[in-house]
């Protein structure tokens, strides 16, 4: 998926698989320059076709790498609508200089690769990634372990380029009963793509509008129709709408993320450096927490960490929402504190897990490290679960139009860091009743500002009375200073979900409302380096 902001964009089967001849172009190498090869291989056909699809790549062989001096390789994937990196970029240079090979590839449907994008279906794009792994393993200058077709292999990339990492690792386990990835470094990606794009069946219509616009020619036609429907209506394409569009999105997205693999009983025993944007309004922090908590085995989690930074997918013009008032800042104090910056931390993580360099020590493994909303400090946690309950009683909000409610939860100084939620008995008078919930900070309801610019919906498709509901709020890290207060924001409208208000007038009434807050009483110590 695409980060559409002013910052640098992330958008942007054995080797019997035939390589397409005549496309290789090796750059002259010197003592300090890598050898760069551009080529394509053939992968599985598109659904309904028998013609193989070409997947194109750029392979960087670092200076000095040879069969006598083999080196690890790091795969790189681009974001939605982007293409592979063909030159020595600032991201690549430190790794190449340190003796890592790199393979960057055009994901199916993008760049020079053929086919259409299927949002990383395991039975389509999963095979693309595995054939690239086979290609890497066939290079004589690549270090092997556990067999000649098992390269020492890492992976990096963000958004769609983070999704392929989980896809490839799980596909290797599913189809080959193997685990050839040795370290992953996914950024701003998803656990459950359907839940990310349409939490509680409420389509992120503003994002779907942009995602549709940047991929009209590249996307699977069914997904394209469903994205356009969600952008126009604010509803997820299921039921009768899915039949009319010939696009059952529940079934389509079922196998496109880690959640499905975990539900099938699979986990990854791979050290993983997870990085997610706390103010990412497409794939919020919750997606990364679910990946960290459920996708990794306990052993892998003890060798991994989650970094929450202030950044990610930011809507153009909506970095600070107007309705309700929201704010976000940029910064990554956790990567700075733990490794001297994200690129340096990632390289250290690869050095430790790919080069097996025991001299590299990394503090904070097995923990969550979250940037506060002002990006001034890093909160380290052993758990992101709620610790404190605040009872609010009855809360009533209109569902078509109305001013946001700001309900006081507590006074500063206090720190809230982790995964809050709202539990209540919900009554909805009309169909498709919706409201949006988040945390806010201010001196009063009049100036309360939504933390990390993040809200999540509650959507009742049919009228109901007194049904138990839990609303998962966006993951947060916020210091509430003395003189300010923490509020629960409840609003019938939010500009990030345009056109998503309820269709019929009425109200949502929440009784016995309890807000579960992850209050951090004292700073948690960073786990010792190891």
Residue ranges of predicted features:
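Accessory cap/linker subdomain of secreted extracellular hydrolases
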Residues: 97, 126, 138, 145-146, ...
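Short alpha-helix in the alpha/beta-hydrolase fold that links the catalytic acid
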Residues: 284-294
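Secretory targeting and sorting signals
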Residues: 1-31
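Short beta-strand/loop motif that positions the catalytic acidic residue
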Residues: 268, 274-276
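Short substrate-entry loop that stabilizes the transition state in hydrolases
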Residues: 65-71, 76-114, 281-284
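Gly/Ser-rich "nucleophile elbow"/oxyanion-hole loop immediately N-terminal to the catalytic nucleophile
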Residues: 63-70, 118-124, 131-159, 175
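Glycine/threonine-rich phosphate-binding loop and adjacent beta-strand/alpha-helix elements that clamp
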Residues: 34-47, 355-530
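N-terminal cap/lid segment of alpha/beta-hydrolase-fold proteins
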Residues: 32-69
């Amino acid at each position: 998926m695409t980060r559409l902001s002013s910052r640098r964009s992330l958008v942007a089967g054995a080797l019997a698989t035939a390589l397409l001849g005549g496309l290789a172009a090796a750059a002259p190498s010197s003592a300090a320059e890598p050898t760069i090869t551009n080529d394509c291989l053939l992968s599985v056909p598109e659904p309904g076709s028998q013609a193989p699809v070409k997947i194109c790549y750029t392979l960087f062989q670092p200076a000095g790498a040879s069969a006598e001096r083999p080196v690890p390789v790091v795969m790189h994937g681009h974001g939605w609508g982007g293409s592979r990196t063909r030159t020595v970029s600032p991201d690549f240079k430190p790794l190449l200089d340190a003796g890592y090979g790199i393979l960057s590839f055009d994901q199916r449907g993008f760049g020079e690769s053929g086919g259409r994008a299927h949002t990383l279906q395991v039975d389509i794009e999963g095979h693309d990634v595995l054939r690239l792994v086979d290609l890497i393993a066939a290079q004589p200058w690549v270090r092997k372990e556990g067999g000649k077709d098992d390269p020492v292999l890492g992976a990096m990339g963000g958004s769609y380029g983070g999704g392929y990492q989980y896809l490839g690792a799980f596909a290797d386990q599913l189809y080959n009963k193997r685990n050839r990835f040795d370290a992953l470094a996914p950024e701003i990606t998803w656990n459950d793509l359907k839940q990310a794009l349409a939490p509680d069946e409420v389509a992120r219509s503003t994002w779907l509008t942009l995602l549709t616009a940047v991929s009209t020619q590249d996307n699977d036609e069914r997904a394209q129709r469903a994205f356009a429907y969600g952008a126009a209506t604010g509803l997820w394409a299921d039921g009768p709408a899915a039949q009319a569009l010939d696009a059952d999105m529940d079934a389509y997205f079922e196998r496109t993320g880690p959640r499905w693999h975990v539900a099938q009983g699979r986990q990854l025993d791979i050290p993983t450096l997870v990085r997610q944007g706390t103010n990412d309004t497409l794939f919020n922090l919750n997606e990364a927490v679910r990946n960290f908590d459920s996708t990794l085995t306990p052993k892998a989690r003890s060798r991994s960490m989650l970094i929450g930074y202030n950044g990610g997918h930011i809507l153009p013009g909506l970095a600070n929402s107007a309705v309700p008032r929201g704010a976000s800042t940029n910064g990554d104090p956790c990567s700075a504190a733990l490794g001297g910056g994200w690129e340096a931390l990632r390289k250290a993580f690869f050095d430790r897990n790919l080069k097996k360099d025991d001299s590299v020590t990394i503090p904070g493994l097995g923990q969550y490290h979250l940037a506060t909303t002002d990006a001034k400090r890093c909160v380290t946690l052993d758990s992101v679960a709620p610790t404190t309950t605040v009872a609010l009683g009855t809360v009533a909000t209109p569902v078509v139009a109305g001013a946001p409610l700001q309900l006081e939860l507590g006074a500063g100084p206090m720190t809230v860091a982790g995964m809050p939620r709202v539990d209540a008995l919900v009554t909805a008078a009309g169909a498709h009743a919706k409201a949006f919930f988040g945390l806010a900070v201010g001196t009063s309801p009049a100036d309360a500002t939504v933390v990390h610019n993040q809200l999540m919906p509650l959507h009742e498709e049919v009228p109901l009375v007194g049904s138990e509901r839990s609303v998962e709020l966006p993951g947060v890290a916020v210091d509430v200073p003395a003189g300010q207060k923490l509020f629960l924001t409840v609003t019938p409208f939010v500009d990030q979900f345009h056109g998503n208000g309820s269709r019929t007038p009425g109200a949502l009434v929440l009784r016995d409302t309890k807000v579960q807050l992850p209050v951090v009483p004292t700073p948690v110590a960073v786990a010792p380096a190891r």
